[in-house]
């Protein structure tokens, strides 16, 4: 990809508020889609960029549809295909959030996350976290779990699908129906001291700090600078 200078981390649900547990209770959950599903998109994007040094973060969280829509107007269908709705009277987390992340190497990441937003789910994501990377030699995005490389071949723009799953081109993973089982194996081996984690605790902390900074920036209206 060359020098990756721009990226997008996205996890959008047009209507997909989790109605079980404490997801819509800020006192117990801490936040809404940003901390629930946005974290997966950001984690994937940072990992693919292999860049974790942040300059500053600015962002906004929105509390619009979660409290605005009465149950009969929510139009939400759960994963089993049944009509489902949330209680808009007790909903007190954001329903969507956006963040702008400036890295110390000059690269920029735009993060979008939503449980409820009047925007069609794009890029064929099929209710998944996906990433888009833009570099000087080519670009890469993840489409329904596949990696799509756009580059130049024989002086012509070309699109190449890389493996049948994003995990297929990450060292240590193999293409298959359940890459999550590989994640479990790697985690257990790391606990036993038999191998290393792909994502370190320090890298995971950067993800958490970015999300917290988006919430802080939304509250204060100011960017949050990292050390």
Give a label for each model feature.
Residues 1-91, 221:
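Predominantly a Rossmann-like dinucleotide-binding segment in NAD(P)-dependent oxidoreductases
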Residues 34-38, 197-204:
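Conserved loop-to-helix N-cap of the C-terminal "lid" that shapes the substrate pocket in Rossmann-like
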Residues 41-42, 183-185, 211-212:
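A general structural signal for well-ordered alpha-helical segments in protein cores
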Residues 61-92, 98, 102-105, 120-202:
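C-terminal glycine/acidic-rich active-site capping loop/insertion
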Residues 109-111:
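Conserved short beta-strand elements that form part of the metal-binding/catalytic scaffold
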Residues 113-115, 146:
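A short beta-strand motif that forms part of the nucleic acid-binding face
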Residues 204-218:
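C-terminal hydrophobic helical "lid"/dimerization subdomain
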Residues 222-227:
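Terminal low-complexity tails and localization/encapsulation signals of metabolic enzymes
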